[in-house]
């Protein structure tokens, strides 16, 4: 199981195929996505990579957090996230993951925070039908109607769909196809829409419900400080 990456949503555009077909894509940018730390079974009880992306001024950081980045010898990051990996997919601390960590044609799962809509009624939030336009209904055409029974159960059940705050939820979209990658600019183009607003932080990982292509680099495609980008050595059979 490979690591994912932290990216920022740039926006949407479209690309054209050789046959003239246009594909709507979302542009995701890798902003110096580096490995900040390891989580091991001996010390933490599980195996994972802690990644960081973006940049942050140290003046606004707690001293303990500054020390964490100093030990890893990486510049302070604005966004941190952990990705569960297998033991043979650990990437060295300080390595920068490249855009060609994902190959064209493979499927990925993306996770982000949806756009906030504020307070919304039942018709907008839950797609309720509302009340009738006439026949005695006045003022409350867009209300949700009854919310519970009479004597039995005599209450409104928990988790009843009602008006309330809409958006700002953690949303995962499954099986988006990678259309194109740009290593020099750190861009990943995925087909379709990605949750969140422009500039929002997005987690991208290999699709859980789709097979990983054979040409996908293992444990990943990364660049160590002071070296050119190179694919990590593959694990030998039976190792």
UniProtKB/Swiss-Prot annotation:
Record region (Disordered) = 140-164, 211-239
SUPFAM superfamilies linked to this entry: Translation proteins (SSF50447)
Q: Does the keyword RNA-binding apply?
A: yes
GO molecular function ontology, one term from the record: structural constituent of ribosome
Spell out the InterPro entries in the cross-references.
Ribosomal_uL3 (IPR000597), Ribosomal_uL3_bac/org-type (IPR019927), Ribosomal_uL3_CS (IPR019926), Transl_B-barrel_sf (IPR009000)
Q: Which GO terms describe its biological process?
A: translation
Any matching Pfam family: Ribosomal_L3
List GO terms (cellular component aspect): cytosolic large ribosomal subunit
As for PTM, the annotation reads: Methylated by PrmB.
**PROSITE patterns per the UniProt record, alphabetical:** RIBOSOMAL_L3
Q: Which residues carry this modification: N5-methylglutamine?
A: 151
Asked if the keyword Membrane belongs to this entry, the reply reads no
Q: Which UniProt keywords apply?
A: Methylation, Ribonucleoprotein, Ribosomal protein, RNA-binding, rRNA-binding
Assembly, in brief, is: Part of the 50S ribosomal subunit. Forms a cluster with proteins L14 and L19.
The record's listing under NCBIfam families reads: L3_bact (TIGR03625)
Task: Tell me the protein family, please.
Answer: Belongs to the universal ribosomal protein uL3 family.
Chain's role: One of the primary rRNA binding proteins, it binds directly near the 3'-end of the 23S rRNA, where it nucleates assembly of the 50S subunit.
- What is the protein named? Large ribosomal subunit protein uL3
Lineage of producing organism: Bacteria, Pseudomonadati, Pseudomonadota, Alphaproteobacteria, Hyphomicrobiales
What is the primary gene name for this protein? rplC
């Amino acid at each position: 199981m490979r690591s994912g990456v932290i990216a920022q949503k740039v926006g949407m555009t479209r690309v054209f195929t050789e046959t003239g077909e246009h594909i709507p894509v979302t542009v995701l940018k890798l902003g110096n996505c580096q490995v900040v730390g390891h989580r091991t079974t001996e010390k933490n009880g599980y195996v994972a990579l802690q990644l960081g992306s973006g940049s942050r001024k140290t003046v606004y950081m707690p001293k303990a957090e500054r020390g964490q980045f100093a030990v890893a010898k990486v510049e302070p990051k604005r966004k941190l996230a952990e990705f569960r990996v297998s033991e043979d997919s650990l990437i060295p601390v300080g390595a920068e993951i490249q855009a060609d960590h994902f190959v064209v044609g493979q499927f990925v799962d993306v996770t982000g925070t949806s756009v906030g809509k504020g307070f919304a009624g039942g018709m907008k939030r839950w797609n309720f039908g509302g009340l009738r336009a006439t026949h005695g209904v006045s003022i409350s055409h867009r209300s949700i109607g009854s919310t519970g029974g009479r004597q039995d159960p005599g209450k409104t059940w928990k988790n009843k769909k009602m008006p309330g705050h809409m958006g700002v939820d953690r949303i995962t979209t499954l099986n988006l196809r990678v259309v194109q990658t740009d290593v020099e600019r750190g861009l990943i183009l995925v087909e379709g829409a990605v949750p969140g607003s422009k500039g929002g932080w997005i987690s991208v990982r290999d699709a859980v419900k789709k097979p990983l292509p054979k040409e996908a680099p293992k444990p990943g495609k990364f660049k160590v400080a002071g070296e050119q980008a190179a694919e990590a050595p593959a694990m030998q059979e039976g190792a």
